[in-house]
């Protein structure tokens, strides 16, 4: 599956106005969305690489070749995205006082005193989102990249991710509004950071701090407008062309409000060095 | 703005001191008309009149008229001559222009010989050397005083005239602008009035100068969605008109009629047209209603096409579906002023309520479909694929048909069970029938994340189900009928699910799913019959008490062929008796025969003997009939 994108930067003072304009354009109310995003980095597990180079007699089967390619191919950062709601933030304060022994405790978690509260990490649904580095050398004025998404089991995600060869790096929150215009998803969002953490934890948070304590990554509070369209078969030139034409149409429509443009390819690099 | 000031636009014409013009004028009059004696008021008036009537081009026309009389050859001749003359004039003009060019070139050749040479004619080059003509500025002799004054006067006159015309042009445009402002104000007032009523006023996408009002439905099919926008145009006097382009202005509406046995027995009411049809508000409302109705009919036809297998037929402007064997519903799109067409007269208003309810139902369902469209549109889209998604047909007819079909089946079953109940009651048997029609509908159910309205409508899109249950005569015997109607998903149509609990006949099971009414009726009556038989065989213990003293002992009935309704009583005296019970929707009959013996196959050889006793109970319940148990006791006596 491929994804075509256009981006624009929206200063904070224009945010409200643009929300209204987009609501008018798409004839729908904005869908507010809050997402926890965990970043995982792939690492090479020792002992898994068994390339037998030079043995020409040892004909590798197709399967074997593919497996080797997969194992020795590029390593990527991937994101794990979980939808949360505003009520989930700051739920820890009530949790600290009410020690409920019957709460579902997670056996793996020993360090923190994790208790049942409105935000349940154990029931947090997750989605794995893989994004390749945007394609290079395309003459078209949109960012195109390979993408894939998959649903993951609920709850503690680090264990399965570790088992698949990914280690947890960091996490952040994305706050924004979604609009749908035919096939285009318009996402007006910004990145929020957690308040400065005391210890360098290597686990995703089990509780969320109060929402007011979240600070935007961009200090001015500006937003990013992202218009994306997904194409099932990236090899189908016809469809890719249609999709980018849809995006150009949107760019033309929003011309007087924001300037949608291609993103810098290297800034969207997801390869792990 | 408040204190307006007047700006004089016309030039002031000052009266100047003139020398007395009388002697000049007298001389002029003498020259024009001769002696003063001939100049009378009458002759002057006549002259003025004549001048007035005379066309300035009159003389020429006279000439033309004269020439028109000439015949064609002469005219052709003249045409050639004139053409020749024109050509000659043109040539002359050309020549003169060339002379002038030569002259100027020669003059210039003194200063810029190279350039001037280019525009010189060859002849001139031959005869005159370059630069042989010079010019210099000389001071003209001073003009005489009178000439200067004349020039001044003329220019002054010109200027005055120009001022005058400019002033009148300005004044004209001022009045025009004033009218324009007035009508523009009126236009904007009306536009604002429309906007204040809550209509969405916007610029037209194609015609960016014009304003439009949006009255349509955003979630409608694209063709109808785009029709929901009309331009608000201004007439010359500034009033607003709604310009819908090529779409006819007539209001149209979907009419629902019910036809029973070939007669129209119900027609949905039109909503009354608003009284002031001229106001822009009512025009917009009417346009909105019309676009809704037309979309409704469009969707009805679209849905009707896929329902061909269920008896729905479509004509050019009519959708028709059967409810039962003798009743059908007709839907058509009519102009709203055409209220009752003369060809089919509404014979009765028996089903007017049904027709009205249907009319409302399909409109509510369309609104629901619009909401569903919005829901679908605002979901995250699926990735682009070459295959376009087809919008499914809305559910408009299907829920309505299902409801009608279901309620007709339920009513039939209810009446059947009531009839049987009546018969049994008149025979003194008490059964307990309970009916819960539309038990599947629970209007209080709320689905999380759905608005109340949508949850309410959604109830009617699910398959309908009604349940009937009955406690029969024999304890622990009961049956239960579920009637399900399904129009959207297979299995389509209505079917009956009957479950029976009969301890005496544990191996009797009804078919799984019954589609036909007759079949269901026969199965149900059969079960009731079996139950009555069981009751009769068990009757002895209970009913015996009253009669015991008289007779001493009674026969015991046994079910010989229960599925045929036959009972047998064997007596020690050899006087066997046979009882045949039959139950139908209309009556319960019990016949008792006496038989002499049983033949080799265990079949009683009865048929020759006449019936000994027989009793029939009907549903109207004749009062002085014995009750069934008494009758049984009676015939059981040996």
Curated annotation (Swiss-Prot), chain A:
Its main location: nucleus. One of its GO terms (molecular function) is transcription coregulator activity. GO terms for cellular component: core mediator complex; mediator complex. InterPro entries: Mediator_Med18 (IPR019095). The keyword Transcription applies. Residues 90-114 are annotated as: Disordered. Pfam families: Med18. The keyword Thylakoid does not apply. Transmembrane segments: none annotated. Keywords: Activator, Nucleus, Transcription, Transcription regulation. Belongs to the Mediator complex subunit 18 family. Component of the Mediator complex, a coactivator involved in the regulated transcription of nearly all RNA polymerase II-dependent genes. Mediator functions as a bridge to convey information from gene-specific regulatory proteins to the basal RNA polymerase II transcription machinery. Mediator is recruited to promoters by direct interactions with regulatory proteins and serves as a scaffold for the assembly of a functional preinitiation complex with RNA polymerase II and the general transcription factors. This is Mediator of RNA polymerase II transcription subunit 18. The lineage of its organism: Eukaryota, Fungi, Dikarya, Ascomycota, Pezizomycotina.
From Swiss-Prot, chain B:
It comes from the Eukaryota. It is found in: Nucleus. Pfam families: Med17. Keywords: Activator, Nucleus, Transcription, Transcription regulation. GO terms for biological process: regulation of transcription by RNA polymerase II. Residues 1-21 are annotated as: Disordered. One of its GO terms (molecular function) is transcription coregulator activity. GO terms for cellular component: core mediator complex; mediator complex. Component of the Mediator complex. Component of the Mediator complex, a coactivator involved in the regulated transcription of nearly all RNA polymerase II-dependent genes. Mediator functions as a bridge to convey information from gene-specific regulatory proteins to the basal RNA polymerase II transcription machinery. Mediator is recruited to promoters by direct interactions with regulatory proteins and serves as a scaffold for the assembly of a functional preinitiation complex with RNA polymerase II and the general transcription factors. Belongs to the Mediator complex subunit 17 family. This is Mediator of RNA polymerase II transcription subunit 17. The gene is srb4.
